[in-house]
Amino acid sequence: MVKTEEMLNNLEELINTPSVVGFYPEIHKKLAEMVGKFGYELEFDNKRTAYVRVPGKDSSKIVCVGAHLDTIGMQVRHVMDNGWIEVKNLGGVNFHNVEGENVYIHTRSGKTYEGMVICKSHSTHVFDDARSRERDKFNEA
């Protein structure tokens, strides 16, 4: 029997766990805890792809169900003197789609900062080039 509320809670917890491309420790820990509740163990290959083996009634056939644990994101490359940040695109961010999005910056020291992606010319009533300025890593912060 499917426990819908528990399944939705688990899904929400996974979705809200930071897991930008190449940054898997938190999502792997969370997934290991979840599958552990069912008596299973999380395994990894050399690329850190996670697997859970669930024995079936007929072990002569193997079924693999896959899903992404990571998401697209950005990596901070440099903090400029004026406080703006220079980012590197991870996994295919389309800068036209992320303007105005809330973001979290996770540091090597374990701190997390909350911010927002904005374009350098973000308002048409203030910046003449707001409609024409390219939305890319050089004009977003």
Predicted feature locations:
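N-terminal hydrophobic/helix-forming segments and targeting peptides
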Residues: 1-141
